[in-house]
């Protein structure tokens, strides 16, 4: 989930270290970080009085990692397979003598001027300290080729046929300076489910940034959040541009990490971060993953795209935003037809560059938040962070017809002191001329990016935008009898996105930034049902998979990766979304780090991949 601070970036030794005990090393030769933990024990569970009781049992993996039979039939027109082990091998850059000399000089500048003078003696804030940001199960792992016929506790529902995928940050190289969790290289974890059987694989998304850094053998692209603050951030930017001018790197091919969102659209699985174009990732018949390349929608997309596009469940249209932190227009809105034809951009006039991580759609509108976390690059000159909480700014939400050709039809409605990093759903209520927005209001708004002594709170909130009066109201959704809990990552039934929904499935983000379980929230009554992962168990986004042919809104299953920090083992849990009952736990052959967002690709969609 790289911040779009990376947007203004684009206008050694490979010794393995123990990633779970990572500590910052000021070295000009960073090490390769990836190193999976061996699994010794796995957990078994039973549901007792609505909570999950955990015990440990010996691991008994007898996995066939070389099964010759494909996990789904090979389509007649399937492209020639790429062997990831071969494509992942580093290829040294073909520099001439002058470039090699220039590279050595710039490396000396980085070591002696930036690291030893500008950065030495300045303690890193927790939000940029690698020892904090990528410690424990936030640390990276190595790639895994497909492991088939995984052990399963319980029974995988036979109606689940397809692949669950989840994206996350997984830095290949040890940071040379500051590092935020959002800065890591993208890695996709995939669990194939078919006829009660499961397989697992994980691969880096082969971004242009990753390929160039692998060729050089070290991290050379600036870390958007971890490094780009203060005078050292300016120096690292200048160093980056110097390397580009000398042909040592090519930022025109993209600087993004593709570590945040995943969506399946127009027969393609897309991995996204808001600092670049999306990347097309292909799911292979044997359960493996391969990166097809940077995807520009056949030349139609020339700008970055945020990592939370929206897919209308009725029209199958794709809606997205793109924002810029340097030049106007700071924000653009566009859409794609179901077959991938792009609309003209709609320029949204904003007075200053604003963080735009998420937005919402209804049947007829797009809902665009313009909130109080903004970009002020000049703050770096004064030694600060360019990501700023502007307390003087009044947050507002824009309501724009989906098919508007310009921003003249935009209606802005103030929603003071509101910062929603994510919006879970939105719908129209014509009887009151209101648009309802469901989101998690976060305080302090910039706490993810800047160190704060105030504890983070993420309050599930209903915001009402009255289109007739131009006023807004908001209220916390949980009933007063329920103690406040942080509800942050999750979703509603995607088949009802943009329409009135009753339920949301959201991660219990406690103790922050870990996730100790998830909640099924009744958005009307405020009642919640909790599924807790037990002592030492933590996960991430709960992903709702609707049951095919079922009309019930909660008819389906919730999938979530869960890691046991006591034993070092990871599982995929499958819960019944209606009664919150655990159906199955798939034991995974390697540790799955905490990550970001997922998607589910059905067996039918697997056959139709481009």
UniProtKB/Swiss-Prot annotation:
The keyword Nuclease does not apply. Residues 1-53 form a transit peptide. It comes from the Eukaryota. GO terms for cellular component: chloroplast stroma. The keyword Iron applies. Binds 1 Fe(2+) ion per subunit. This is 9-cis-epoxycarotenoid dioxygenase, chloroplastic. It comes from Oncidium hybrid cultivar (Orchid). The gene is NCED.
